[in-house]
Amino acid sequence: MSRLSSILLIITLTTLQAIAQQTPGVAVLIVKGQTEIEGKHLGIRRIRTYDVSSAEIPQSFDGFRILFIADTHYPSLFTDRTLASLGTVVSEIAPDAIMLGGDYQEGCEYVEPLFATIMRHPPKYGAYAILGNNDIERCTDTIIDLMRAYDIKFVEDTAVRINKGHSHITVAGATNTYKAFEENPSPTLNLPPEEFVILLTHTPDYAEDQDIANTDLVLAGHTHGGQVTFLGFLAPVTASHYGQRFLKGLNYNTAGQPVITTTGIGTSRRNIRLFAPSEVVLLTLHSWSRNERLPEPDIAIDTRPYLSQPITIVPETTYQEPLNIPQKL
């Protein structure tokens, strides 16, 4: 297993409680307050935002914004009115790129209006997508054809570069059919370790079950945040072999790679959400120089809800001077 590059994540959460945890393979984690946009857009309860800083993000991508959308299950609870609201969200945010995490529809006829809405204002640096388990069970050819028609790049089992100036970042896509994990190794395995790589996977379990070497950040969905939970903290049904571990938000696989799991927008089986708000995820990338001094760590971890002060957690290996950032092999 390759060693991970040090990655600094400055995270603005929208959950009731933000808990910072020291995690293997990550040099610094800062939880920097919270922002919640609640009820502004019909059918989308919140926009969860993350600021992601890494030495492997090129300077030209500093401030680059990615909108991640998954599990629309259109129409389910996500009706015509809320579809229009999604279009408004995309328009107002005006991201540089859009990434789609699968489970788009509850019927083939709903795919085109969904993609048409998302791509009404095409992002400058493109849209990138994978399939979810629902999309593999039905409408697969229709979905892939419509991706092509709306200039959405289908990235399963491949990796593509997003070019900006003379630099680039890479987005890769995993195939999630559960039974195909061993047959479909991660498309990140042969990527150059110095690149900043985002891996799209429908289920977060893939990031734990597979070797995803050379991946800097995983974006996943599928769990719906439990869809029905006890006060947002405990879900009887998680749609994950790992229980609550990858239910929502930022977590880490055993290798220490960050996995962001969105609660998504729509529903499946039963049209109800309870303490599992629908959301889209907005990432802002920041180029971080290896020579920059890091924030002084707070030894005490504050777990109070609605954090207003940054919390810095630095593993012991990073207290050395000068700061040596481990690199991927």
Residue ranges and their predicted role:
Residues 2-65, 76, 312-329:
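Acidic, histidine-bearing metal-coordination/catalytic regions of metal-dependent phosphoesterases
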Residues 25-48, 255-326:
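Acidic, His/Gly-rich catalytic cores of divalent-metal-dependent hydrolytic chemistry
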Residues 45, 54-67, 152, 160-173, ...:
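Beta-strand-turn-beta hairpins that frame and shape the catalytic cleft
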Residues 60-145, 150-153:
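Membrane-embedded segments
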Residues 69-70, 97-103, 126-133, 155-157, ...:
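Active-site neighborhood of phospho(di)ester-bond hydrolases with catalytic His/Asp-centered motifs
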Residues 72-75, 104-107, 133-137, 160-162, ...:
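Solvent-exposed loop/turn segments at secondary-structure junctions
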Residues 87, 144-145, 149-152, 158, ...:
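Binuclear metal-dependent hydrolase catalytic cores centered on His/Asp/Glu-rich metal-binding motifs
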Residues 119, 204-281, 289-290:
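Conserved beta-sheet core of the metallophosphoesterase superfamily
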